[in-house]
């Protein structure tokens, strides 16, 4: 079964203690996100069931990101599902494939980053988290990623203040944006 701790104040004040307690379980639960503005929900299955299961139609907020995935770099599991959150109040979804994710992963591990999956999208999320933790803005971190990440990709990265979209320089994966008075919508496939 799943047990959830839904006290943001507890998680913020006693984060290390929570991690220690969680690691003592035989099958430890995972923290999917931290922070006070963004909540992450992951599941494998049909999107309609996922929306109904978590009652997304009852949510309020300034922005939301959903992702339907065709796995190319890792297994189809709940932990491998998008979005990936590797920093406080930020998350990433990704369409494409990073060809240098293993070398970037090794460098991040040398810098002390810990990974939960073998997913190339998690590597991108950790890369951006590290860049923003060093003081870069989301825009600057995304711009630097064009020099450091190889492959074909489109990223959508959300923070508590908004979101950014980035395509690789070759632009193999679509980035379709629609803007009305009520919303801005994005898709990384034309039929979306």
PLM-predicted stretches and their roles:
Residues 1-192:
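Conserved short alpha-helical segments that host acidic/polar catalytic motifs at enzyme active sites
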